[in-house]
Structures are given as C-alpha cells and as structure tokens.
C-alpha cells in the first residue's frame, strides 16, 4: 500500500523487483534463441574464424602436417645443393643428359591440375556436387598422366639409382615427390568416393575437399622447385 505521503523505499524496492522479473521474462527467450542459433550454426571449413565460429583444428592439423613435409623436402633440396656445390662437375661426367620435353609437359599438366581442382572446390561451395565430381575426376586423371609420364622417363633414362651421386639424388627427389603425388591421388579418389553419398559434401561441410586441395597445391609447389633445381640449373 502506498503511503499518503508518497511512495516509500519499500514500494520502490517492490517495483524494482517486478521490473527485473518482467525484464528476465522478456530477455530470457531472446537469449535462448540466440544461444540456439549459435549451437545450430554450421561452421564453414576454410574460414579461419566465423562470426560465431572457432578455428577449425582439423585444418590446423593439415597445415602442421604440410609444414613437417616441407621441412623434409627442404632438407633434401639443401643436401642436393650442397652436393652440387662441392662436386667439381655437376652432373658428373658421363651422366646422360636429361630431356626437358617430357618433364616440361608433365610440369604443365601438374600445375594446370591445381586450377582444375580449385574449380571443384568452387563448385561444392555452390552446392554443386556434380561439378565437384567432374573437376576432381579431371584432376585425378591429370595426376595419373603425370605419374605415367614420370614412369616412362624412368624406364628410358640410361642411368640407375647407383650410377653416380647425381643419379641417386635424381631418383630420390623425383621418387619421393612421386609418392606424394600418389598419396594426393588417393585423397582425391577418397573425395570422389564419398561424394557419391548425397549430401556428404555441401556448401557448409566440405573439409575433405579443402584438405585434398591444399595438399595437392603443396605437391605442385614442391614440383616447381624440384624441376628448377634438377632439370634447369
């Protein structure tokens, strides 16, 4: 009851309690809706941070793996350059001259495959699963052609692994890279196999696609460095 002299402190306290209760009743559903929206929001792979998302630790793991692989190749390239600098002649006398035509064509095929593969990722970002399958299928075919060209080169080279130091370096570097191309092909084929299931990849869920593409780009960059060091210098 309000005093004839006006509202008392108790009245103010009671009114404040009622006002706070009303505010809680109004705000609580709004907060619940926002929280539900956060929980139901789908993180899009490829974005380091979303509006409500967090870093994708799976992609972080892929990047760490590629950093480790880069360190291995860096060690191999460094060893190759050291051997080259300390030898009186490089390649050593008697080493068959490497042909540039086939490796050059192979390089164009492998580098072009990265652009083709990116079209596949762009397709799935538009929920175009058929486009993903088409472009990744072409990329796989280009990777197989690259490996076939490399095997053809091996069979027609007039030197073996133990011919001399240059031959050993050549086979180790190109062979190790070839293993990485093979692994990249397996990743691409895995994506193609999984894409047969409707809805497995979509605009908001395509981590496997991005991981395979990132690995393939890594393989391409390594080949460019290898081609320059071994074939051109």
Curated annotation (Swiss-Prot):
GO terms for molecular function: cytochrome-c oxidase activity. Its EC number is 7.1.1.9. One of its GO terms (cellular component) is plasma membrane. Gene3D superfamilies: Cytochrome c oxidase, subunit III, four-helix bundle. Its main location: membrane. It is a multi-pass membrane protein. One of its GO terms (biological process) is aerobic respiration. This is Cytochrome c oxidase subunit 3. It comes from Synechocystis sp. (strain ATCC 27184 / PCC 6803 / Kazusa).
